[in-house]
Amino acid sequence: MTRAAVRLGLAQGGLCFWEKGCMTEMSEPTIRLATPDDAPALLAIYEPYVRQTAITCEYEVPSVEEFAGRIERTLKRYPYLVMELDGRPVGYAYVSSLNSREAYDWSVETSIYLARDVRHGGLGRKLHDALKQCLIAMGITNMCALIAVPHDKDDEYLTHNSQDFHAHMGYRLVGAFDRCAQKFGRWYDMCWMELVLAERVPNQPKPTWFPDLLA
């Protein structure tokens, strides 16, 4: 996906995909860039993950103000995307730096959340693919995901679905941690999965931060 395609897609109110040499705009659902004003709607999606699952290791639901600040901080460097169905936000995806040290600039940690009433309908793939295309245009080489997984078998708080989803997206398992996170009084494993977006070469050009890509 070219930088011009990213700019045009977002300017037209929906992300565009680069397919078979031509740019085609998505029909419903639509994907757009988030703003801090989206915080209440996106927090409503996130809240059940905090209260009812071990998918996120966060214990307390952040305030709307804190969540808006997270969006704003992300957008200073990276894409933060919102998926809508009939004008209603039903999912969001963003990335953060894998590490604050400059040598890690080519690698990001990904996060993706869908409203629980629209999961398992293929929307996660579309949202992830849109995020991936933005990162490719930026010059990011590595998408990394830190995923909570059950230590033994699935339970009411956590399944292997997230790990399976990322495997279907092309990620490979690159690391695992034994019972390193506790939530709801239970211990869970964590795993790192990685998707390589571009060849890593000596003197790799620095990524273009997302706001500069849209300028």
Spans of features found by a protein language model:
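Acetyl-CoA-dependent GNAT
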Residues: 61-117, 128, 134, 138, ...
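Conserved GNAT acetyl-CoA-binding A-motif
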Residues: 135-158
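Conserved acetyl-CoA-binding loop-helix of GNAT-fold acetyltransferases
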Residues: 120-136, 160-164, 168
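Conserved GNAT-fold acetyl-CoA-binding loop/helix
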Residues: 43-70
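C-terminal "cap" of GNAT-fold acetyltransferases
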Residues: 179-215
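Glycine-rich phosphate/pyrophosphate-binding loop shared by adenosine-nucleotide-utilizing enzymes
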Residues: 29, 88-92, 188
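A short beta-loop-alpha structural element at the N-terminal edge
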Residues: 30-42
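A short, internal acetyl-CoA/4′-phosphopantetheine-binding micro-motif in the GNAT/acyltransferase core
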Residues: 111-120, 148-152
